[in-house]
Every structure is written in structure tokens, then in C-alpha cells.
């Protein structure tokens, strides 16, 4: 963050502030809009002068879901298709409780899992190795996040 107006001195940044912004790059059409899914500053790393009137502040930030993931541990048993279990972990109020859209490719076979004190993302990465697509019959699933939401799908889709 480059500050030539002295904003950081009149409104000090301490951490835990929410960021609302759009991210654009000249070589790519469109933008990533963080106005709907806020980011949170978790550390103000460095402050230094880049010129006589300008200060640079390095902000460490992350999404709300990422910070919730770090703070949440799952110690529970689940029964159902793996895609249904992923849905419960991402959207469940006792787990990540994410407001972001979730795009899931249905998996087949009812499974039982005991999650041993893992974060939601760790739990999903553990159980995805057992998922088999109901549509593609593919046994290779990936879990990832894009600006549009979370995706749990097979390589073949």
C-alpha cells in the first residue's frame, strides 16, 4: 500500500481491519471483486518511506474463510457420499460455514469417515482421495478455490 496522503497516520492500521477492493491486471479482462467476500488484514508487516512524501506499508491479508479454516477443527464422524460430506464441511454452521458458492461434482458410494481434529480444508483433502465421480467414473478429485467460489470436482470434468 502506497500512502502519500498520510491516511495510515490518521487511520492507523493495526490488523483485523476488513479490506474491500477490486483486483485488476492490464493483461486480463475482468477483475476479482473482494467487495462481496471481504479480506481481513492480519498483520501490518513493514512501514518505510519510499520518498519524501510517500510511505509504503506491507499488509498481510487473507480471506475470512481462510482465517476461519485455521481456527476451526473437526473431530466428527460422517456418513454419506464424499460430495455430500464436502458440502456439509464447507456450508455447515459447525464447520466452515462459508457464504461463497460451492460447485460440486457428485460422487458415488456411501462412505464412513472419522475426521481426527483436522481443519476443514485438511479434512476435505483427506477424504477426496476416496471419491469416485458419479458422472465420469473418475477416481481423481481436486478441491480448489477461485474468485467465483469453491470447486470439488474430478480431473475429468
Regions found by a protein language model. Name each.
Residues 13-15, 91, 95, 129, ...:
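Short, intrinsically disordered, mixed-charge
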Residues 13, 77-78, 123, 152:
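Aromatic-residue hotspot detector
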Residues 1-71:
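Assembly/oligomerization scaffold segments
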Residues 54-55, 62-68, 79-102:
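Glycine-rich, acidic and aromatic/proline-enriched surface loops and short helix-turn segments
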Residues 56-58, 63-65, 103-157:
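Short beta-strand-centered interaction patches in the first periplasmic/extracellular domains
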Residues 29-35, 96-101, 135-141:
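Short secondary-structure capping/junction motifs at helix and strand boundaries
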Amino acid at each position: 500500500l502506497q500512502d502519500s496522503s498520510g491516511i495510515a497516520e490518521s487511520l492507523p492500521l493495526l490488523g483485523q481491519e476488513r479490506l474491500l477492493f477490486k483486483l485488476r491486471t492490464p493483461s486480463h479482462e475482468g477483475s476479482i471483486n473482494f467487495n462481496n467476500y471481504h479480506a481481513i488484514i492480519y498483520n501490518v508487516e513493514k512501514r518505510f518511506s519510499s520518498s519524501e512524501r510517500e510511505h509504503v506499508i506491507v499488509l498481510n491479508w487473507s480471506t475470512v474463510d481462510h482465517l476461519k479454516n485455521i481456527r476451526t477443527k473437526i473431530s466428527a464422524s460422517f456418513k454419506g457420499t464424499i460430495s455430500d460430506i464436502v458440502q456439509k464441511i464447507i456450508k455447515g454452521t459447525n464447520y466452515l460455514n462459508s457464504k461463497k458458492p460451492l460447485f460440486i461434482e457428485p460422487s458415488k458410494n456411501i462412505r464412513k469417515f472419522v475426521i481426527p481434529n483436522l481443519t476443514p480444508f485438511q479434512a476435505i483433502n483427506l477424504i477426496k482421495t476416496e471419491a469416485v465421480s458419479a458422472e465420469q467414473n473418475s477416481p481423481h478429485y481436486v478441491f480448489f478455490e477461485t474468485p467465483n467460489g469453491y470447486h470439488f470436482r474430478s480431473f475429468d470434468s
